[in-house]
Regions:
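Structural motif
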Residues: 1-3, 94-99, 183, 203-206
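Flexible, low-complexity segments enriched for small/polar residues
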Residues: 5-21
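Short alpha-helix boundary/capping elements
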Residues: 12-13, 38, 111, 115, ...
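N-terminal accessory alpha/beta regions
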Residues: 17-136, 161, 167-176
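Active-site substrate-binding loop specific to GH73 endo-beta-N-acetylglucosaminidase modules
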Residues: 121-245
Length: 245
């Protein structure tokens, strides 16, 4: 295998027709892939923050309706998710910067949200890759992680949108029907430490998970589709995890 084909396979997405012949020097080609920021891509036709919000509200409202309403609402969400997948595949099949697209795919997998796990995540996954992964793929990791933590797709996927500081005003005001207060959800904090950053052998403790979860309380979703921070849900006072505020 010659150097050009090796570079296209290892660092890109394989050779498109004629691409191998156009590349004269594989090292220069690879360096050129990193020139400029990551290419931006547009959302599929008809997929807007408003249409996503409408579709997700329909899913929630359909829970109180009949079976046909639920099927119709879920079908719209699935269709939006499918159009996002087609959009992404089209970009990767035609891009002139396959190394960047490979990096986008890598980081989308590392900081993944599952479209099959929760119906609320499916129509948001495309926006997550466009607005979280792509803008930071050639930048700082911490900026990407912070953007990931605040995006509605991640807030829904790992339940941080409903995490409430146990002694917060939000917990006191929002008791469940059985009289129990809404409380702390550790799902995202654990994932952030175990998979996204430090790793399973990263030296953190269960107390670190709990303190990080408290720091992250109040990061929620404004209606459906927008990130918001709500102080009344936050754990008080401010906590520390592994010595850092």
């Amino acid at each position: 295998m010659d150097a050009t084909l090796r570079a296209l396979n290892r660092f890109g997405l394989g050779a498109r027709q004629g691409e191998r012949q156009r590349i004269r020097d594989s090292r220069s080609w690879l360096r050129g892939q990193l020139d400029g920021g990551a290419p931006t891509i547009a959302a599929p036709a008809g997929v807007t923050p408003e249409s996503i919000g409408d579709a997700l509200r329909a899913v929630r409202m359909a829970g109180q309706g009949d079976e046909q309403q639920r099927r119709d609402a879920r079908r719209r969400v699935v269709e939006m998710g499918a159009s996002e997948v087609h959009n992404t595949l089209s970009v990767r099949a035609t891009t002139d910067r396959p190394f960047v697209e490979r990096l986008v795919a890598f980081w989308s997998n590392h900081l993944c949200v599952s479209t099959g796990a929760k119906v609320l995540v499916a129509p948001l996954a495309g926006s997550y890759e466009r607005d979280v992964i792509r803008p930071h793929v050639l930048g700082r990791f911490e900026d990407m992680v912070l953007a990931s933590a605040k995006h509605p797709a991640m807030l829904f996927y790992l339940d941080n949108f409903q995490s409430v500081g146990p002694s917060s005003r939000g917990a006191q005001a929002g008791q469940r029907g059985n009289g129990q207060r809404r409380g702390l959800n550790e799902n995202y904090a654990r994932e952030l430490l175990e998979l996204h950053t430090l790793g399973v052998n990263g030296g953190y403790t269960q107390q670190d998970v709990q303190e990080l979860a408290k720091i992250l309380t109040g990061w929620t979703v404004n209606g459906i589709g927008g990130q918001a921070a709500r102080a009344m849900r936050s754990a008080q006072p401010r906590r520390r995890a592994r010595g850092s505020a």
